[in-house]
């Protein structure tokens, strides 16, 4: 649900839109959970949710009917939490074909977005993710990239590499915090409520181990993702 909450915060505070819409797949827990979280957070942020549409699954190929309703409702911003294989070739082009030219935003499922040949369709498309090599706000990022390239024949690290890297150092921090005679239980207790500063952002883990963290926003320009901003979690 966290990506949906962050998207609502971004729409309200950064883009400063007033009318938003959401489209999600009811048969997919990821899509529906994030989509509903966005709608709830948007209302709390004072945004008007002019349309809340859904599809029977998260891998349909036809969304024109729902998108026509969203366009007719006057939405300035559409949150569509689907995967790269659906949002890229179907939802975004179909939204443009019904006359919707506003913002489209998604979660990290947009990483590696499959696009059609007409890259202009993807202007005003954004998504949240964990990591960007262009993030100048985090000094750890460039050090990580240099070290990774040196150890891996100049290969570029991706989001999952960065997440794995942070996981190792987060565990090391927890073990150190647990002390010299660390046990499984003491390490688990050390992780609970622990704050961590990593390549993928700064975050705090709650008692269940779920992170409340900063999130990267990328914007597509000429079909290529570019760093837009970093959103810090609400206190």
Give the location of each predicted region.
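Segments of small-molecule ligand-sensing domains
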Residues: 150-162, 172-225
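An alpha-beta-alpha
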Residues: 1-54, 77, 171
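Short glycine-centered, acidic/aromatic-flanked micro-motifs in structured strand/loop junctions
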Residues: 24-25, 82, 148
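Sec-exported extracytoplasmic/periplasmic mature domains
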Residues: 12-17, 39-47, 68-75, 93-100, ...
């Amino acid at each position: 649900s966290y990506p949906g909450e962050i998207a609502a915060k971004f729409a309200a505070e950064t883009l400063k839109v007033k009318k938003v819409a959401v489209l999600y797949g009811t048969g997919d827990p990821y899509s529906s959970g994030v989509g509903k979280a966005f709608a709830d957070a948007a209302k709390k942020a004072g945004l008007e949710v002019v349309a809340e549409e859904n599809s029977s699954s998260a891998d349909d190929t036809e969304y024109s009917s729902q998108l026509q309703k969203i366009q007719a409702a006057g939405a300035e911003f559409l949150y569509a939490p689907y995967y790269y294989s659906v949002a890229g070739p179907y939802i975004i082009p179909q939204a443009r074909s019904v006359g919707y030219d506003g913002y489209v935003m998604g979660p990290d499922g947009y990483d590696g977005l499959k696009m059609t040949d007409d890259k202009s369709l993807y202007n005003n498309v954004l998504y949240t993710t964990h990591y960007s090599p262009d993030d100048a706000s985090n000094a750890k990022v460039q050090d990580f990239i240099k070290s990774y390239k040196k150890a891996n024949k100049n290969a570029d690290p991706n989001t999952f590499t960065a997440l794995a890297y942070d996981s190792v150092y987060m565990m090391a921090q927890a073990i150190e915090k647990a002390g010299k005679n660390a046990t499984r239980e003491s390490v688990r207790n050390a992780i609970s409520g622990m704050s961590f500063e990593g390549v993928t952002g700064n975050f705090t883990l709650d008692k269940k181990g779920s992170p409340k963290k900063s999130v990267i926003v990328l914007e597509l320009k000429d079909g290529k993702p570019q760093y837009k901003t970093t959103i810090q979690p609400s206190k």
